[in-house]
Every structure is written in C-alpha cells, then in structure tokens.
Amino acid sequence: MQKISLLIACALTLAFALGNHMPQAPARIGCAWPLSTCPVCLKPLGATPVIKIIDDPKDPSLNGREIRFESEQCAATFEIDRAKYLKPANEQMVREQLPQYPAINCVVMPDESLTDPNSANAGKGENIIVGNRLVRTCCGQCARRVRRDPVKWLAQVDKGIVADQGAKYPLKVCVISGAPLPSEPVNVFIGSRLVEVATPADALKAQQNPIETLAKLDAAIAALKPSAEKKPSTDAPPIAKPDAK
C-alpha cells in the first residue's frame, strides 16, 4: 500500500510539474495585423477574423507575429508556405508605413543616415517587416540583426516615432474611450503611427481592430481642421458715398 501511495504521489508531482511547464503561446510582438485583407485568399477580413500568433522560437523574425485570416482553412494553408503569403503582405506594409516612418538614422548603426522616408528613393534601402512593423536599416547586416531580436530594435523605432509624432500629436482626448488624455498617455504603435490613449485597457482595445483605430484617429484629426476656407466674395463692393461738401 505504501508503494502504491508513493507511486501515486510521484505521479501527481510529475503531472503538476509538467502542467506548470506546459509551453505557453508566444506573446504578440509588434502590433496587430494592420492590413484589411487575409494574406492567403486576399478577401476582406470580417468582424471576427481568425487570429493566429506564429509560434516559432527558431525564427525570431516571425516568432510572436500576429496574422489574421478569413478562415481556419486559410490559416492552415498559410502554414504550408509562410514565405509565399508573407512576401506580398510585407511589401504592402512597407508601402503603407514608409510615409509615417520617423526621419531617423539606422537603428542598429545610428551614425548611418537613411534616405528621407517620404522621398522617391525611400523604398530602395533595407526595409524589413518584423512584428507587422517597418524597420529601416542601412545594410543587410543590420537587417539580419533586427530579425534576430525584433523587440530590441522596435523599441528604438518607437523612440523615433514618439520624438517625431508625439510633440505634434493633435488630440487631447483618447480615440478609444473619449476620456481626456493624461499628462503621460499610453503610447500605442500601429505600423509607423502613434496613437495616444488614456489607459492600458484602451491600448488593448486599440490593437483589437487597428484599422478601425486609425480610422477614428484620422477622423478626429480631420474634425480639428477648419471645415473650409471662406471663398472670396464675388459680390460687387458697395458704392462709396460721395464726400460731403
């Protein structure tokens, strides 16, 4: 009986230990999927897309990257040939994120300058996507370093975005909750854009639907601008009264 009890105790201890060391799904790195379409079928993503986070510790450039699909079938097809479906998606992300990318030097070698992100030559450098976000580097060697540790180098991009967009951020209220922004708002990065929100809970909501969040941001910014400049009057000027004699 003692042997049986000992075996049961050992089995329970082992099960508990294994339960505590079950592999956890990777945390999302970077931002939520910023495109409106599925990378496999290219159909628009509905209100309830299938959300997957790549679990591949052997490839840090992909591990933790969120992908959104139109269906579970598309998610399964994606796993057969990730590179095939990510290539055009990455190219689209580069095109969309370049205009807002901060005017900073290479994040790996800060002494090396890059072309203006808004210039015609901006797309000809080493532009890579990690965690659904653009990182520009001066050379292929630096690009490889970014792929090996995306979190480290995305943090440098974040600093550049805050320095570039934070000072001129036009809103005083949170686009998610409508609450006034605190003196130190929570920064959310969607692609190369900064969204300031009031609380960490608002930050989570902002990433749930990044396209909708950016649409709200753009609408709020547009509402701050004058509706239209007054058109010059086409009426004839009033006739001046003659001077009294």
Residue ranges of predicted features:
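Bacterial N-terminal signal peptides
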Residues: L7-A17
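Intrinsically disordered, low-complexity terminal tails/loops enriched in metal-binding residues
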Residues: L18-K245
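Positively charged n-region of N-terminal signal peptides that target proteins for export
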Residues: M1-I4, K245
